[in-house]
Design a protein with these regions (language model features):
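Periodic glycine anchor positions in long extracellular repeat architectures
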Residues: 24-27, 40, 123, 139
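Stable alpha-helical elements in mature extracytoplasmic
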Residues: 8, 15, 42, 49, ...
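Sequence context surrounding c-type heme c attachment/ligation sites in exported
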Residues: 11-17, 43, 108-119, 138-147
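The canonical Cys-X-X-Cys-His
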Residues: 17-25, 78, 115-124, 182
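Extracytoplasmic/secreted proteins, especially bacterial periplasmic and envelope-associated proteins
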Residues: 11, 18, 45, 62-65, ...
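Axial heme c-ligation environment in periplasmic c-type cytochrome domains
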Residues: 30-37, 52-94, 130-136, 154-179, ...
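N-terminal export/targeting leaders of redox proteins
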Residues: 1-10, 51, 176, 187-191
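Electrostatic cytochrome c docking/interface patches
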Residues: 1-16, 26-34, 84-112
Length: 191
């Protein structure tokens, strides 16, 4: 399930009109903090997530319903459109102590709990790795990141199958507190 990089952002813009109801006209101002910021997200990652929503592999009924009848080209166009938009940053608001601890986890992991460094896949600025299909995580809302890391930890999100369950393995070693400080920290990362 990988994009052919043949998406047309202009065609995707037309497809995205219905998406604006939840993700905002700019793709970066979701109406609820649990919804992702899509603007500037890596195209390959977006396409793969859309395809998983459509097939039901990633179980979010609202998204599956929105994608009924969409062709592969439609999904590629949507991914190209959102990838073409300027990314929106955020601000970390945690205490200095929490931000230092989150930075340690992000850059170095937690060896004794077998938690890999987030930066290994998402990069030092949280922009991900477009070629590998790893997502941009900087600028996401704290609520969205907490929800996704918790779903990975509890085994409810399995969209990492093509990577051997990597995110589930990483998140499994994180406490609620560590997830919360990481979510705040990555929101404020700058490329």
């Amino acid at each position: 399930m990988f994009a052919n990089a043949a998406g047309d952002p202009e065609a995707g813009k037309l497809q995205a009109m219905v998406c604006a109801g939840c993700h905002g006209l700019d793709g970066a101002t979701p109406v609820l903090p649990e919804y992702p910021n899509l603007a500037g997200q890596n195209e390959k990652y977006l396409y793969n997530q859309l395809a998983m929503f459509q097939s039901g592999t990633r179980d979010v009924p609202l998204m599956t319903a929105q994608l009924i009848g969409k062709s592969e080209q439609d999904l590629e166009d949507l991914a190209a459109f959102y990838a073409s938009l300027p990314a929106k940053g955020g601000e970390a608001t945690g205490t200095d102590e929490d931000l230092r601890r989150a930075q340690q986890i992000y850059k170095g992991g937690i060896m004794d709990k077998k938690v890999a460094a987030c930066a290994a896949c998402h990069g030092p600025g949280g922009v991900g790795n477009a070629q590998a299909g790893f997502p941009r995580i900087n600028g996401q809302s704290v609520g969205y990141t907490i929800e996704q890391l918790t779903k990975y930890r509890e085994g409810h999100r399995k969209s990492d199958e093509s990577f051997g369950g990597m995110m589930r393995g990483v998140a499994h070693g994180l406490t609620d507190g560590e997830i919360a400080i990481l979510a705040d920290y990555v929101r404020g990362l700058r490329p």
